[in-house]
Swiss-Prot record:
Entry EC number(s): 3.1.1.23
Cystine pairs: none
Name of the featured protein: Monoglyceride lipase
Catalytic residues identified in the record: 123, 251, 281
Pfam families, alphabetized: Hydrolase_4
Catalytic activity: Hydrolyzes glycerol monoesters of long-chain fatty acids; a fatty acid ethyl ester + H2O = ethanol + a fatty acid + H(+); 1-(9Z-octadecenoyl)-glycerol + H2O = glycerol + (9Z)-octadecenoate + H(+); 2-(9Z-octadecenoyl)-glycerol + H2O = glycerol + (9Z)-octadecenoate + H(+)
GO BP annotations, alphabetical order: triglyceride catabolic process; triglyceride metabolic process
Compartments where found: Lipid droplet; Cytoplasm; Endoplasmic reticulum; Mitochondrion outer membrane
Gene behind the chain: YJU3
UniProt pH dependence: Active from pH 4.5 to 8.
Matches recorded under Gene3D superfamilies: alpha/beta hydrolase
Length: 313
């Protein structure tokens, strides 16, 4: 297996476990470790399809160095939460029920510390994040939303053919737990050869299994945002909450046009879309250091701008 290319500068926290609703979730809380240990806020990270905690180490490390705590968990169907044949097995109900559990856990801790909680989601997690901003139980208690290459619509390069689109709902209904290897598009994910080598040899990442139900549900979740039927976004988006979407302009997995349309439809007075020329799909976790440094700096500036409370010791 090729090594993880990034050298973590802080101390990697231990993976922790928590039982909830029939699953044993692996999660990680990364505290601020920057000399002063003053905390400006916390970011709850929602990973993409088939990802897990280690994929977020570079982002979490940088957040820590810049005064932000972070929290992420391996979703049902991914990582240590769902090993072996349970990988890829989940559905819409569990996605949001599980998320509400961890949102409540983090909100409780952040309120006790007097710090804001932001939500960040990448790809499939970006679609979850933006839908949470519209339908989440605690959507108005989150201080802001950040989407990274969110799954709203697939890029034509990745979109499956019409016959498959037609049969997908039937497969999800009658064979929900049947899994397929969807294939990992390494060139679409990143232009960095070292990260490609790591990901392509990582047993936690390949094969990239998804169940018919999981795949159907995350596609419908994105379509809900893109179609925006009955002004779903305008009527439901968290009141007065800021949102930023950051998307690689050369992303051939999730189409940047989906992000553009969401920002157009979103009623927030504080909304922003940043497109990055030359950047592919995984701009925070797996792209080149040059791309990462640019997007992280933009994210940090956005967080700093929206952090009204003074840093807490």
């Amino acid at each position: 297996m090729a090594p993880y290319p990034y050298k973590v500068q802080t101390t990697v926290p231990e993976l922790q476990y928590e039982n909830f609703d029939g699953a044993k979730f692996g999660y990680m809380f990364w505290p601020v470790q920057n000399g002063t240990n003053e905390v400006r806020g916390r970011v709850l990270l929602i990973h993409g399809f088939g990802e897990y905690t280690k994929i977020q180490f570079r982002l979490m490390d940088h957040l820590s160095l810049n005064g932000y705590e972070s929290f992420t968990f391996d979703q049902r169907g991914a990582g240590v939460t769902s090993p072996g044949r349970s990988k890829g097995v989940t559905d819409e109900y569990h996605v949001f029920n599980d998320l509400e559990h961890f949102v409540e856990k983090n909100l409780s801790e952040c309120k006790a510390k007097g710090i804001p909680l932001f939500m960040w989601g990448h790809s499939m997690g970006g679609g979850i994040c933006l839908n949470y901003a519209c339908q989440g139980k605690h959507k108005n208690e989150i201080s802001g939303y950040i989407g990274s290459g969110p799954l709203i619509i697939l890029h034509p390069h990745t979109m499956y053919n019409k016959p498959t689109q037609i049969i997908a709902p039937l497969l999800a209904k009658f064979l929900p737990r049947v899994r397929i290897d969807t294939g990992l598009d390494l060139k679409g994910i990143t232009s960095d050869k070292a990260y490609r080598a790591f990901l392509g040899s990582d047993p936690m990442s390949v094969p990239l299994y998804g169940s018919f139900r999981q795949i159907h549900d995350f596609m419908q979740r994105g379509a809900k945002l893109y179609k925006n039927e009955n002004n779903y976004i305008q009527k439901n988006f968290a009141k007065d909450k800021p949102v930023i979407i950051m998307h690689g302009q050369d992303d051939t997995i999730n189409d940047p046009k989906g992000s553009e349309k969401f920002i157009q439809d979103c009623p927030s007075a504080d909304k922003e879309l940043k497109l990055y020329p030359g950047a592919r799909h995984s701009i925070f976790s797996l792209e080149t250091d040059k791309v990462f440094n640019t997007v992280f700096n933009d994210m940090k500036q956005w967080l700093d701008k929206h952090t009204t409370t003074e840093a807490k010791p």
